[in-house]
């Protein structure tokens, strides 16, 4: 006689996470969370509705995702985020790993076509929980600092320096110079240590005068302290000019909690939404709120 565990597609022995953290994005966590995710008919309908709007040509590019405490909105949003980003996990793309979850659904073919339509565009996806991250410089810098992380940079002034080098098409030269100056050590290993600042400066001084470096460092520090939605929009525009085939997507979790903690305010949200909406559908924001029932709607 078959046992229940023999007919289920999930492993009953696996631990179930009480909380899904959008800030946790290592490969093992993503695989574990995807393996445990169950796409019900209701969630499949929400996913289809979202993708229908997201893949359209509409200019509005903001989405609310709301639900009661424990409804799984963070879990759902994280799965959508990684479907869009489509990272390779243990040798297999996220979208390919997700497809078996469609088996048995009423709208399987429609949903599969919608997911495959994501292949037409290259997305840069940023996910973060705004109630758990440093809010010293406001919501806009929260978004920018995590955008830097999504690019593989640091989230501080060094990351902004890396970003500027990328915009000037000097980042590859910088990486090669660091390796040459540090006995073959990679910058991504060096920057984890206290010696990162000196290694950064030494490499940059090979193609920039010292006074120019110091002035750039000063300007970046001031920029971060006064970072706002307009600066975020300008930085994202520069990135999109460099990569015209890309679209940017922000998933911002626990907005209600961050508001209640006074880490952000409604003016922050309004400013961010207005600034990014001026970029059309090249920059999307998906904001997660606490409410009594789950719904997805256009902002």
List where the protein language model places each region.
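Walker A/P-loop-proximal flanking segment of P-loop NTPase domains
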Residues: 1-71, 77-78, 82-84, 96, ...
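P-loop NTPase motor core
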Residues: 34-37, 63-68, 75-195
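Conserved alpha-helical scaffold flanking the Walker A/P-loop in AAA+ ATPase domains
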Residues: 108-118, 230-244
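Flexible beta-alpha connector loops of hexameric P-loop NTPases
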Residues: 131-135, 220-226, 256-265
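Long, low-complexity, polar/charged, intrinsically disordered or flexibly structured peripheral segments
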Residues: 183-232
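Substrate-engagement module of ASCE P-loop NTPases
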Residues: 232-242, 268-284
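Conserved P-loop NTPase "ATPase switch" module shared by AAA+ and STAND
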Residues: 240-263
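Sensor-1/coupling segment of RecA-like P-loop NTPase cores
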Residues: 257, 275-298
């Amino acid at each position: 006689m078959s046992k229940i565990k023999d007919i289920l597609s999930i492993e009953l022995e696996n631990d179930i996470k009480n909380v899904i953290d959008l800030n946790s994005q290592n490969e093992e966590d993503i695989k574990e969370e995807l393996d445990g995710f169950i796409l019900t008919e209701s969630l499949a309908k929400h996913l289809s509705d979202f993708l229908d709007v997201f893949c359209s040509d509409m200019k509005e590019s903001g989405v609310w995702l709301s639900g009661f405490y424990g409804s799984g909105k963070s879990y759902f949003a994280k799965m959508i985020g990684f479907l869009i980003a489509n990272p390779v996990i243990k040798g297999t793309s996220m979208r390919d790993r997700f497809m078996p979850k469609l088996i048995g659904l009423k709208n399987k073919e429609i949903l599969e076509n919608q997911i495959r339509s994501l292949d037409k565009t290259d997305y840069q996806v940023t996910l973060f929980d705004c109630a758990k991250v440093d809010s010293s410089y406001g919501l806009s810098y929260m978004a920018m600092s995590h955008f830097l992380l999504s690019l593989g940079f640091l989230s501080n002034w060094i990351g902004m320096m890396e970003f500027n080098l990328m915009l000037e098409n000097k980042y590859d030269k910088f990486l090669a110079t660091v390796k040459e100056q540090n006995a073959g050590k990679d910058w991504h290993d060096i920057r984890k240590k206290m010696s990162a600042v000196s290694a950064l400066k030494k490499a940059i001084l090979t193609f920039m005068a010292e006074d120019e470096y110091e002035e750039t460092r000063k300007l970046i520090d001031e920029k971060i302290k006064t970072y706002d939605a307009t600066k975020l929009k300008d930085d994202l525009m520069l990135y999109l000019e460099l990569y015209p085939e890309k679209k940017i997507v922000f998933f911002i979790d626990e907005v209600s909690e961050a508001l209640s903690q006074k880490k952000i305010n409604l003016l922050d949200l309004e400013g961010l939404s207005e600034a990014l909406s001026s970029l059309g559908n090249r920059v999307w924001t998906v904001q997660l709120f606490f409410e009594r029932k789950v719904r997805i709607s256009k902002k």
